[in-house]
Amino acid sequence: MRQSMPNIVVVLISALLVGACAASGSRVSPAESQVLFVCEHGNVKSLMAASYFNRLASQRGLPYHALSRGTAPDSTTVPPAIVAGLLGEGFHVAEFHPIAVSVADISKSRRVVLINTALPETMHPAGIPQELWTDVPPASSDYAAASAALRRHVEALIGDLSPSDKN
């Protein structure tokens, strides 16, 4: 019985680490390239875009995974209306916790997409393509319009990925 106790501890710690990674959105395998979506608070537009991107990339068999981050997270949760809207589309984000964007997030990314925001001056690593989406309306006041705009952009982004990245 004594020898099985360390095994149980290892299993519990492993489970906690896997859960923490899933909640933070950091599930990029070595074979995947990371796309980083950034909005101001990190809990609405970037979360919606990352959700749409991950589903579409998976459906198309692309080696990409997206993360959601914020330049100035002001909450530890996702607004209930956004949770409900995304749940209606098959995304379970109730346990998601917004995270502030870091230089490491940007450095690990193949592409950075800024949604109605800008990166802080100290976070502009050279050589990483960035694009700005300025036409996404607030999801809190018009979820359907924000969803449509984000889906349109995500479709174009996936279509724009280099052919060598799609294999």
Task: Specify the residue positions occupied by each region the protein language model found.
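Bacterial N-terminal signal peptides that target proteins for export
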Residues: 1-9
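Bacterial N-terminal signal peptides
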Residues: 8-19
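Bacterial signal peptide processing site
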Residues: 22-24
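Conserved active-site segments centered on acidic
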Residues: 26-101
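A short, aliphatic-rich alpha-helical micro-motif
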Residues: 106-107
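Conserved acidic residues
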Residues: 110-112
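Short, polar loop motifs at secondary-structure junctions
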Residues: 115-121
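Phosphate-binding/catalytic loops
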Residues: 121-167
